[in-house]
Each structure stands twice: as C-alpha cells, then as structure tokens.
C-alpha cells in the first residue's frame, strides 16, 4: 500500500491479514511555504468577496436553492450517478408521468434533503458525530446502498478500490472498526478546537480526515463534501450556503483523489491544501459570476414584464421559475393560490415573452421550461 512510512498515520492489520491505514489525529505539523500562504490569502480574499455579495442579496433564496441543487447533482455525479439538473427538477415537480428520469435521481434529491436538514439543525446544535449520522440517514433513505445501514457508522471493514476487489487489492483500506471509533472521537474534538489554524486550512484538513476515516459503508464522499458547506455556514465564513466545491472536484476528479491518497501515503499536506484552496478561489469566483447572472436575468424579466394590473402576480411566477425552472399550470395555480385559468394566462404571457417554452408538444398536461434560468444555474460560470 505504500503507507508504512507515512508521516500522516500508521498501518494496522485488519481482516484476512490485510493492512489498513489509521490517520493520526488532527492537526498535523504544517510547513507554511510561500506558496501555501499565497493560496490561503487568495482564498480568504475571494471568499470574503462572496460573503459580501451574500450579505447584500435582496432575495437570498433566488440563489440558495438553485446553487444547492446544482451541488447535489455534481457531488452525486462524482459517485457515479447520471441524473441531470433537469431530471432533479422533474422529480421534485412530480412530473414523472411525463418524463422518466434515471432511477438514481432520488439519490440526488436526497442530497438536497440532507443538506437542508443539516443547515436547519445547525441553527440549534453544533456539528457533531450525532448530527453527521442524522444527515447520513437522510442522504441514504430509500436508495441504492440503503442496506448499508443509513445513519449508522459501519460495523465492518470497508475499502476503496475497483468493484469486487479484495482488501489486498484495494487502493485504500480505512481504519478497522475499533480504530475508526477512536479516530472519529478525535475528529469530533477537532471540530470544536480551531488549534490556532486559519478556518479554510481547518476545512481542508477536516475534509481529508473524514475521507480517510471513511466511517460509513456508503455515502462517505457525499457526506464529506456536504460537511464543507455546513462548516462554512456554521463558522460564519458565509452568511448563506453559496460556495460548493463539487464542481471543482468533479472537473479535477483524478487530481482530487490523488491528492487525498498522497496525504495518507506521503503526508503531502501542502499539496492537498493548495489544491483545496485553489478550489475555494475558483468556485467562489464561479459563484459570484453565476449569482450576478441570475440576478441580472431576474431584473431583466421584471423590467420586461412590468404591467399595471397583473404585474405583481406575474412577477411572482418569475420568482417561482428561479426555484423551479420546469413548471406546469397546475403548479403555478397552487403556488400563487389562483384559479387554473388565471395561472394559465400568466404562463401564456411568459411563453409569449420568450421566458417559458412548452416542451412536451401535448395539448394537455403541458410542461414549461425556463431555458435561460436553467442555463444560468447549470452552465459554465465564467464570463
């Protein structure tokens, strides 16, 4: 395995005489090179800009819910799901009789549910092992891997590697169960102790450590990435959950796993932290571009649709599209609490304005998509 001389931990025997890696408790001894300091400074600066944007949002939900769903799609995609953002909106809008999204879309939906649950619970309780288990139960409810004890830490050895590989063939073997519990106790203590370290460095260390402990039989990667968002909010680095790193990890998937593995094998903390901090910079900038694009789109629609009598209701439909870019007339009727005929009139107005497009080609049970909104949420963030 190459872990025998690692400065980041030690190896122990596990079942079938295989070797497993046990990471040392955090924090490690870090070497503060010029490169690491510069990357940290850049990440702090750009994250501060994103926080400023978040504090000045007139309607935070305009961004929070779309960003959350995009993150759910991308974080789940790293684990092999095929569901798209459109699939997720179809699933959430209960338009399943019209479209057949892939079966793994529930996994993506569960990610949204787990993240929302965690953010709500953090308003009452600090992040803890107990809360992490609760979030995992929401993540794994009713999906593949449900037999993998949702909401419970593993009671048997697991490993990371090709499907069906033995422990001896695995790329990485996490701590055996007794060592896992010791590592988790130390992990929880570090959550409450800043150790005099900058918050973003702590965040990078915590993400590695959770991946190294791998305390669940399934869902570890998604929980590890979800924790980043929760801690950014819990530590008040951001006023709203606006920064997500899964797009960066997905775009650099091979480097992501290589850096994590290199910490375990070689103690390559600096390389991992610099990779992580560059992700904070890249995704903070992406979030600001995407946020401004969505805000500009909303303001453009509002200017386009300002009319005397129906203006207020019509603008409510516009705001609905940023939360649910695929809608039916029935949904509009229910959300606005208006008659079907009135909702149909509003939808037709938006279709005539080029804001909505009917996508089924049917005379009944029609579905309308806000193409520009969807493109702004899921498209490239640069520009």
Where are these regions (language model features)?
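FIC/Doc superfamily catalytic core
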Residues: 1-383
